[in-house]
Amino acid sequence: MQFLKMGVWLLCLSATLQLHSQSPVKLKDQPIQLEGKIRFTLKVPDGYTIKAACEGLRRPRFFAKSPDGRLFVTDMYDRTDNKKGKIYILDGWNPVTKTFDNVITYMQNLHNPNQVAFYTMNGEHFIYVAETGKLTYYPYKAGDIAPSSPGKQIATFPDYGLSYKYGGWHLTRSLAFHNNKLYVSVGSSCDACVEKEEIRATIVEMDPDGKNQRFYARGLRNAVGL
C-alpha cells in the first residue's frame, strides 16, 4: 500500500501489478469524485488505482506514526497566519473500503502547526508539537484521543507572522530526531534581507527536553521537512 497526498485530500494508491523500473510506465486516466461534487482526473500507472482515504482536511502538512501505530497529520487550515490549525488522528484503516473509519481531532486552535514528532524518554512516550512561535511536548499514551496532561514548552521562535514589516515569511517549524537530539528548522523572514533575529534561517539542535540549544546550521532559507 502506498499513500499519496494531493491538495487537501489524502489519497490511497494500491498496487495490483508489479511495475519494473526498466520498462516504460504506462499511464491511464482515472476519474476521481469527492464530496461536494468535486471531480477531476488523475493519471496512474497501469495496475494501480487511487482513492480518497480521508476527506475534509483544509491544509494537511506532515504525517507522523505514533508509538501505538496510528497516523497523525497536521492541518494548518489555510495559507494565512492563523490559530485555527488542528492535529488529526487517522485511525481504523478499513482494507475493504480503503478509508479510515475514524478521523479524530487530537488538538485544535493551534498556531500554524506544521509538524509533530514522537520520542521516547526513559520508557515514556511524548508527542512534540511545532507551532510558529513555540515548541511544546506532551506525554503520550497508547489510545490517547487528546493530550493526557498539560504540555511543557521548551523553545520559542519569532512569532511575527505575515504582518511582520521585514517580511514575516516562513511560518512553519519542522522537526527531526537523530542520535537523541532534536532538530528544529526556523525559516528566514524574507528572501533577501539582513535578519533581525539570529535564529532566522537556521536549524537549531537541542536535547529532547529543550536543554543545550545551539545552532546546527545557518543560512538555510527554509529547511521545511528536514
What are the residue ranges of the model-derived segments?
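Beta-propeller domains with acidic blade repeats across secreted/periplasmic ectodomains
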Residues: 22-226
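Bacterial Sec-dependent N-terminal signal peptides
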Residues: 1-23
